[in-house]
Amino acid sequence: MRKTSGKQREGAGVSRQLQNIELPAPTFKAGGSLARALQRRRTIREIGDKALPLQTLSNLLWAACGVNRSKGPFGVTGRTAASASNSQEIDVYVALAQGAYLYEPLHHRLQAVASGDLRRLAISRGQAPAGAKAPVRLIFVADIDKLVHTSGFMEPGLRNPDVQRSYYYVDTGLIAANVYLFAACVGLAAWFHNCDKSALWAKLRLRDDQRVLFAQTIGYPASRQTAVRRQNARRRARV
C-alpha cells in the first residue's frame, strides 16, 4: 500500500467542492496521417482563451496517456505512451478555470483535486504570458513510488535518484510528444514549458515522493480564435 501524507488527508475536503468529471469515450475519427501530423507539429505559444469541448479534452487526454489495450507488460493495462517497465509513473494533472484534476486513465475520468484556477502557477515566473489565459494546462508529476514498485520487474539500481530521473524525464517527454501530435492532427496549439514546481506541489497536495516536472499548455491558436471572432462579428453586422 502506498503511503499517504497528512497533507493529502487535510486537503480532501477542499476537493469535495469540485466535482469529478466523467469524460465521454474517446473518438478516433478526427485527424489525419501520422506523416501529416509530424509535418505540422510545432510549438505555438500564442494561445487563445476559448474553452475546449469536453469531447476534445477527452480525446486529448486519451492520446496523451490513455489506455489502449487491456493487457500490457507485467500484468497491467497498456498506455498510448510508453513508460519504464510499464511503471506508468507519470501522473497527468489537468488545470482548468474552475480547478485542478487528476486524469485517471483506467476509468478515463478527471478526479477533482483542488478548487480554484491554478493555470497561472503552471507557467514559471518570468515566462511570457502569451498563453496565460489558455483553457487547459497539463501538469506532469512523477510518482517515485510507482517507479520503484513496478509490478513484476525490478531493475538493479532503480532506487538510485539519477536512474529514476533518467526514466521519468524520458517518460514525460513521450507523453508530451503524444500531445503535440494530437494537437497537430486537430488544429490545436500546444506549448511544453516549465512551471512553478514548489507552488504546484503545495496546491496539488502531493506526497514527498512525488515530483512536479513540467507543464504543457493546449488550446486554440490565438490567430485562429481572433479570425473566428472577426468572422462572427461580420456575420452579425450583416443580419
Model-derived segments and their meaning:
Residues 95-98, 142-144, 218:
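Short, flexible beta-strand-to-coil junctions
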Residues 149-152, 226-230:
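Short, charged, solvent-exposed linker or helix-capping segments at domain edges/interfaces
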